[in-house]
Structure formats: structure tokens, C-alpha cells
């Protein structure tokens, strides 16, 4: 990548929270995709904070889709561009949160990938429904406390493992699937650029820590994102035609306790009886990632 940073096409002045992860994710996505891009953005934090009527922070064509149909709208945009003979000159990128991607909009997204539409989908995974009050999604990690899975006398928080969305999208026959993190801007920009240059449905899954929903200082967003990677709870890799082709190595993984202790959504693990055993379970997830993805 050039030492000169590519131009971004989303402006300041939006109403995102201090330290907003979605602002970073949108910025890096457009730095990778470039100016000749049409964005489809389902309902969520990014849509709400970037387009308060009658204003917009977007400097590229932007479409607000429903929570559930970003994949269908992207399919229609791509088909229309093909019919007009303009698809080779314009990139179609959908940017959605984990709720619209992994839950509410999964059916439409699956259909778009199964049909082979030529577009890139970027999931900004802040691991809960932040826009509506920090409710659990299928992207919420094990033992995280949310407003619908609160930690208490009978629960350590979310009882279910995080859905493996990259594997699901790879199973659709996608030519390119990658994970990344807003804590590594160059990595995210490079992967988005690569994804948008490949013909066919491509998928980027980016972790995007939310200070409001996760409970950490607003100045620590990128630091927390890096810590997720350094503890191996967020492996970064690329898959081409279903095969892992590149992995970001972690030479000296840090204990997951450092990552968990930095967030209020996991604070109960350090105060409740039995919390130590739960931390060991989360460490086992990181250890599995190290072995499965060959992170060392």
C-alpha cells in the first residue's frame, strides 16, 4: 500500500458516539473501495448517525435499506448496473452491523451470495444490537452481559457461542472471505480493496468494538480492537474459494483476561463465584483459534 493514505468518502460532522466504531469501519471501507462505489446500508447505528435528515456524511451514492433486505437491495443495484452496461465501472458495497448481517438480514444475504451477484458485503461486528439498546445478537460472544442476557445470580451472561459467520459465507461458494479489525486500518483497507476487485459475491467481517455497549473509555476503541487480535479471540485471516490462504500470526498471545478485564460487559467474571472457570472457557476459545488457524 502507498505511504499516502487513500481519500475517505465519509465526512466528519455525523452524530456518532465518541470513539464510534462504525465511523472507523465506514471510513476504512470506503478508503478501500474508492469513489466509484454505491453503498447499501441497512438500518443500524451507522445509518442513524450518518444521515440525520436532511444531512448526510456520505460522499458516494448511498441507499438506506431495511434491516432485513440489504442483500436483496445490493442484488438489485448490481443487476441494474449490469443492464445499463455500467457494472465494470462501479463497485457495489453493502455495509451492515452484526444484527442486520447475522440475524435479521441473513436470508436476503444468503440468497444474494447463492445467486452469485457481484458485490462486496462488509459486516461491522460490534457484537450486539447497539442502536436499540445493547441487546444480544448471534454475534455476541460467550459470557458477555447484554440487556437481554444480563449477568446475575442464574447466568454469566450470553450462554451461546458466537456464530461463525465467515465460515457460513465461505460455504456459499464465495471466491473471497476475510476477517479484519478496525484496530488494523491498513489490513482492513487492503482486504476491502481486494474484495471489491474480485468478480462475484465477497465478504469482509470486521470486528468493531463499541465503547458504549462494551463499556470502555471512548479513547480506547482501537486499543481494544488490537487486544482482541493479540489475545487470539479475533483471528484475522483470508479465505479464497473456501481455503484459508493467509493468516495474521500472533507470536506471543496475551491472556484473554487482559481483554476481558478492560470491558464492563465482562466485569462480572471477576466478581462472581465461578468466574474463574468461565474465564478458562474463554481462554479455551482463544487456544482453539491458535491451533485451528495456526496463529503461531
From Swiss-Prot:
Reactions this protein catalyses: 2 oxidized [2Fe-2S]-[ferredoxin] + pyruvate + CoA = 2 reduced [2Fe-2S]-[ferredoxin] + acetyl-CoA + CO2 + H(+)
Ligand binding ([4Fe-4S] cluster): 17, 20, 45, 210
Ranges of biased composition (kind: Polar residues): 140-150
Region described as Disordered: 140-159
Gene3D superfamilies: 3.40.50.970
Cofactor binding: number and manner: Binds 1 [4Fe-4S] cluster per subunit.
Cofactor: [4Fe-4S] cluster
Protein name: Pyruvate synthase subunit PorB
Lineage, top ranks: Archaea, Methanobacteriati, Methanobacteriota, Stenosarchaea group, Methanomicrobia
Amino acid at each position: 500500500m502507498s505511504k499516502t493514505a487513500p481519500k475517505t468518502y465519509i465526512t466528519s460532522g455525523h452524530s456518532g458516539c465518541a470513539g464510534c466504531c462504525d465511523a472507523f469501519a465506514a471510513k476504512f471501507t470506503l478508503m478501500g473501495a474508492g469513489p466509484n462505489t454505491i453503498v447499501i446500508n441497512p438500518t443500524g447505528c451507522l445509518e442513524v448517525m450518518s444521515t440525520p435528515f436532511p444531512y448526510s456524511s456520505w460522499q458516494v451514492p448511498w441507499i438506506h435499506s431495511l434491516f432485513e433486505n440489504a442483500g436483496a437491495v445490493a442484488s438489485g443495484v448490481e443487476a441494474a448496473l449490469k443492464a445499463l452496461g455500467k457494472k465494470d465501472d462501479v463497485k457495489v458495497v453493502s455495509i451492515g452491523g452484526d444484527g442486520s448481517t447475522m440475524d435479521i438480514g441473513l436470508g436476503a444475504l444468503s440468497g444474494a451470495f447463492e445467486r452469485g451477484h457481484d458485490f462486496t458485503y462488509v459486516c461491522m461486528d460490534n457484537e450486539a444490537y447497539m442502536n436499540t439498546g445493547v441487546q444480544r445478537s448471534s454475534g455476541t460472544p460467550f459470557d458477555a452481559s447484554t440487556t437481554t442476557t444480563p449477568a446475575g445470580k442464574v447466568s454469566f451472561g450470553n450462554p451461546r457461542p458466537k456464530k461463525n459467520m465467515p465460515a457460513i459465507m465461505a460455504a456459499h461458494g464465495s471466491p473471497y472471505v476475510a476477517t479484519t479489525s478496525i484496530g488494523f486500518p491498513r489490513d482492513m483497507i487492503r482486504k476491502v480493496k481486494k474484495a471489491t476487485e474480485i468478480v462475484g459475491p465477497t465478504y469482509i467481517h470486521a470486528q468493531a468494538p463499541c465503547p458504549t455497549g462494551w463499556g470502555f473509555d471512548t479513547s480506547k476503541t482501537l486499543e481494544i480492537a488490537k487486544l482482541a487480535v493479540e489475545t487470539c479471540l479475533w483471528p484475522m485471516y483470508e479465505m479464497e474459494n473456501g481455503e484459508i490462504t493467509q493468516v495474521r500470526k500472533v507470536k506471543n498471545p496475551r491472556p484473554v483476561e487482559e481483554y476481558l478485564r478492560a470491558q464492563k460487559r465482562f466485569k462480572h467474571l471477576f466478581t462472581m463465584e465461578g468466574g474463574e472457570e468461565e474465564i478458562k472457557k474463554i481462554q479455551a476459545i482463544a487456544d482453539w483459534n491458535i491451533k485451528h488457524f495456526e496463529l503461531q
